[in-house]
């Protein structure tokens, strides 16, 4: 999941560099959502293993 977040972040950077603001914003939002979801799942997995 971190891999997909990084891929979308790179797409956002490339799109913003090339002037595609809408695509860059959408890709950045997807990257942010995937990163937040991955961190939440990591924390849940970490806590469940400790119990």
Swiss-Prot record:
Membrane topology reported for the UniProt record: Multi-pass membrane protein
**At the top level of its lineage, which domain of life is listed?**
Bacteria
User: Which Pfam families does the record match to this protein?
Assistant: DUF1328 (PF07043)
Q: Where in the cell is it found?
A: Cell membrane
Q: Which InterPro entries match?
A: DUF1328
The UniProt record lists the keyword Phosphoprotein = no
List the keywords (alphabetical).
Answer: Cell membrane, Membrane, Transmembrane, Transmembrane helix
Q: Which GO terms describe its cellular component?
A: plasma membrane
Which sequence ranges are marked TM in the entry?
Answer: 6-26, 28-47
* NCBIfam families tied to this protein: PRK13682.1-2
Family as reported in the entry's similarity comment:
Belongs to the UPF0391 family.
Question: Which protein are we looking at?
Answer: UPF0391 membrane protein Pcryo_0139
Q: Which organism is it from?
A: Psychrobacter cryohalolentis (strain ATCC BAA-1226 / DSM 17306 / VKM B-2378 / K5)
């Amino acid at each position: 999941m971190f891999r997909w977040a990084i891929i979308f972040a790179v797409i956002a950077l490339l799109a913003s560099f090339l002037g595609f603001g809408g695509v860059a914003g959408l890709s950045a939002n997807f990257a942010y959502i995937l990163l937040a979801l991955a961190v939440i799942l990591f924390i849940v997995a970490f806590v469940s293993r400790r119990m």
